[in-house]
């Protein structure tokens, strides 16, 4: 069981119950898919706005702009290994996710679910720094999202639009 802690720092995220339900479903599906469904841990999600996200992105990545999702693992972990007592933190910027969903012709909830799955995989040690890592992570995302009845998010994206 994983405890989910949700914080909202933007009035635009007006349905905290929906955020929790999407997070719980994405987390349960992702953990089961990577055979970590019996892990006992905790995850924290902050749903914020672009302005706040830009500050965090500048502080931690040196990029003075917003981004869709940032993940901060509580402990270093090798992909496939079980996490410690605290999985980590995921931060999601509402305006960026809304804009990307519109631009890519996706529903907001489907794109938000994708961002949550993407963040969870980062917390579990997966990355996309190399081509091999990116292919592995995208494959997992596709498989998890398919289990959630969400279309392949990469099928129509150009290389410049990818996360």
UniProtKB/Swiss-Prot annotation:
Cofactor(s) needed by this chain: Zn(2+)
- What are the GO BP annotations of this UniProt entry? rRNA processing
**Compartment(s) where it occurs, according to its Swiss-Prot or TrEMBL record:** Cytoplasm
Where, in this chain's numbering, is Zn(2+) bound? 118, 122, 128
Which molecular function GO terms apply here? metalloendopeptidase activity; RNA endonuclease activity; zinc ion binding
* EC number assigned by the record: 3.1.-.-
| Manner of cofactor binding, per the entry note | Binds 1 zinc ion.
Would I find rRNA processing among this entry's keywords?
A: yes
Top-level enzyme category:
hydrolase
Q: Name one GO cellular component term.
A: cytoplasm
Query: Which Pfam families does the UniProt record give?
Result: YbeY
Keywords, sorted A to Z: Cytoplasm, Endonuclease, Hydrolase, Metal-binding, Nuclease, Ribosome biogenesis, rRNA processing, Zinc
Protein family (similarity comment): Belongs to the endoribonuclease YbeY family.
PANTHER family reported for this sequence: ENDORIBONUCLEASE YBEY, CHLOROPLASTIC
Q: What does this protein do?
A: Single strand-specific metallo-endoribonuclease involved in late-stage 70S ribosome quality control and in maturation of the 3' terminus of the 16S rRNA.
- Protein name, please? Endoribonuclease YbeY
The gene is ybeY
